Amino acid sequence: MQSADSQNTPKRPRRDGSPRTPPDSPLADAETSPSHDLDPDYRTWGPEQVWSFLRRCGFSDSELLKRCREKRMSGSLLPFPEDLGISSHGKKMKLLNCIQDTMKVINDPIHGHIEFHPLLMRIIDTPQFQRLRYIKQLGGGYYVFPGASHNRFEHSLGVGYLAGRLVRELSEKQPELQISERDILCVQIAGLCHDLGHGPFSHMFDGRFIPLARPEIKWTHEQGSVMMFEHLINSNGLQDVMKYYGLIPEEDILFIKEQITGPPESPIKDASKWLYKGRPKEKSFLYEIVANKRNGIDVDKWDYFARDCHHLGIQNSFDYKRFLKFARVCEVDNMKHICTREKEVGNLYDMFHTRNCLHRRAYQHKVGNIIDTMITDAFLKADDHIEITGSAGRKYHISTAIDDMEAFTKLTDNIFLEILYSTDPNLNDARMILKKIESRNLYKFVGETQPMIQRIKKENYEHLPNEVASAKPSDVELEAELKAEDLIVDVINMDYGMEDKNPIDHVRFYCKSDLSKAVMITRNQVSQFLPETFAEQLIRVYCKKTDEKTLFAARQHFVHWCLINDFTKPQIKKLPLRKLKKELTTATG
């Protein structure tokens, strides 16, 4: 049994950056640290909550903040600016407006009760952001997983919230980083707005439809997000609101856009050159929170792992809250990067494994993918006959709406129903495809294979249907003539997020003995059970015709094509075992 004295003996301080690490400054003191979540009733706030609130509202006056702490002012004084030492009429009005616009609380099924700054709420309450309510997060996956009815709207809220969590964790843990309230707000806005540029059915639009409808351009939803963000700010007059809350639009709008798209293109490939303009090199770590171009560990993934798994009914094995507790900024090659404890390396491999599993089980589900393909076919046939009104009354099609953000604001998943219920004879072909989806009369899966040696290059994808159609076995009599237009060849690249590279090679870790020194951990130091390769390619073939004769011909062509190209043994769609053996035996002679 412990004595009373031993029970009162303070525990040995931890040196790993965890919450029990002794505070380095008054800001980090456990008794005085401002909470992440302020109670909506400001009258209950203590001095530190008032201090945090004033900072969030853009009051950067050091004397005011110092006085607030020294006199231990409570929230009950906020309606009386003079008692806080605020004499300027403009600042009085700003404070009173801030009180009216205190943090809004939203009940999210993934993260619980989450708070948003008034400026974030002004962004959320715009037509450009509300549009995300009508874009399915997983596109055609909803037709396979009935629970996957969630949209880009709630995912964006989650990413904005987590971005704030991570940057505040770093700020409170390492005050020497000098993370300002401006920085925090900008990171949250970038998280909130990172998916504004998604089109109907999310990745189907920029991954399948636009490359076929407009092959001459390279357009991504990240580019669309930046364009839509600019449109959102300008059309809703939010520059003045940003200034009101302490931002500098000339600098901060650029910083927000850079977090979404990455640095500008440079003809000189020099890793040591700082290409960003929104924030200096000393704050390089801020660019690793929303969309981490360095190693892919970012809050975007954390939210969609948790949210997608919740709606798909799949177990999520990655806990972002643990990463938050061990995240620290260390210097690596004269740059500041977000690092984690060396003991967390196994959990990070689990994170990337979770991503790979989600792609295998859900994102690249063969039925979900073919539904995306059918919707793409329908949109291509409807493209010239759909008109969307944009700025100055100009008309745009589905594929050209990306050139005008006023038109793009009106383009959501609802275009599916517009085509489906249209009586326009020009939309007959597109309408028939969508009716097939509704009645589950889908293109038929023929088979799946993998290249054994060399992966198929993207520029060769369009030639694959012709290759399969031409691969007619000479020793098999077929009753149907197969044409290239009857086939869909879907090439899927599965990886850990960095093509064939190991993403952990781009992560740095710190040890308990030295919190400031970043180290690299090689794959062999972790486990012998980790993957040897980090990327593979799957090739799936589908047939648009559903009669037995054409499907039999398609299987024969597919098997012969695999043999010609020395691909892996083809996996054929469910056939009776005897019939499958007979087909393979016939094809191989």
Curated annotation (Swiss-Prot):
Biased composition (Polar residues): 1-10
Residue numbers carrying Phosphothreonine: T21
Catalytic activity: a 2'-deoxyribonucleoside 5'-triphosphate + H2O = a 2'-deoxyribonucleoside + triphosphate + H(+); dATP + H2O = 2'-deoxyadenosine + triphosphate + H(+); dCTP + H2O = 2'-deoxycytidine + triphosphate + H(+); dGTP + H2O = 2'-deoxyguanosine + triphosphate + H(+)
Family annotation (InterPro entries): dGTPase-like, HD/PDEase_dom, HD_domain, SAM/pointed_sf
Cofactor: Zn(2+)
Residue ranges constituting the SAM domain according to the UniProt record: 45-100
Record cross-link Glycyl lysine isopeptide (Lys-Gly) (interchain with G-Cter in SUMO2), residues: K457
Transmembrane segments: none
CDD domains per the UniProt record, alphabetical: HDc (cd00077)
Residues holding dGTP 2: N107, V144, R322, R341, K343, N347, H365, K366, K512
Highest taxon of the lineage: Eukaryota
GO biological process, one term: DNA strand resection involved in replication fork processing
Alphabetically ordered keywords of this record: Acetylation, Allosteric enzyme, Antiviral defense, Chromosome, DNA damage, DNA repair, DNA replication, GTP-binding, Hydrolase, Immunity, Innate immunity, Isopeptide bond, Manganese, Metal-binding, Nucleotide-binding, Nucleus, Phosphoprotein, Ubl conjugation, Zinc
Residues that, per the record, bind dATP: Q137, R152, H198, H203, K301, Y304, D308, R355, Q364
EC nos: 3.1.5.-
Positions contributing to dGTP 1 binding: Q137, L138, R152, K301, Y304, D308, R355, Y363, Q364
Stretches assigned to the HD domain: 152-277
Positions with a binding annotation for GTP: K104, V105, D125, Q130, R133, R440, K444, K512
Record carries keyword Cytoplasm: no
Protein name: Deoxynucleoside triphosphate triphosphohydrolase SAMHD1
Organism: Bos taurus
